[in-house]
């Protein structure tokens, strides 16, 4: 991967924030989360299929991952407000954002172990795909305002 390709990936992070913010406002935080996690699932499966030395697919997959990373910075506050309401937003968003950071730490550890155990980072995408599926299920079942109504609906 070239330096230019690597430097271009954070652009997708920046685009993901307003894009998924718009989706969360226009559709719902739940729908935005399901779309985001579906992209993560698709990119994880693409990386498992591609293996190593497939630069074009690697760049495409990581552009998708960066898009979704930025997207969560818009989805998480919207989902927190939808689920807990604004009266309890600050306290609950702190917990949600802590979990986001914890996931980043654990993801790095899991990726490192995958490299150590299998000699490649490719297998780090197995738990990523599984967790994306779990996240989709959780979003569909639980990401709704208590009482069953989406905010603004």
Residue positions per predicted region:
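Short, small-residue-biased leader/transition segments that mark boundaries at the very start
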Residues: 2-9
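Paired intracellular helix-loop junctions of major facilitator superfamily
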Residues: 81-90, 119
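C-terminal ends and interior cores of transmembrane alpha-helices
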Residues: 39-52
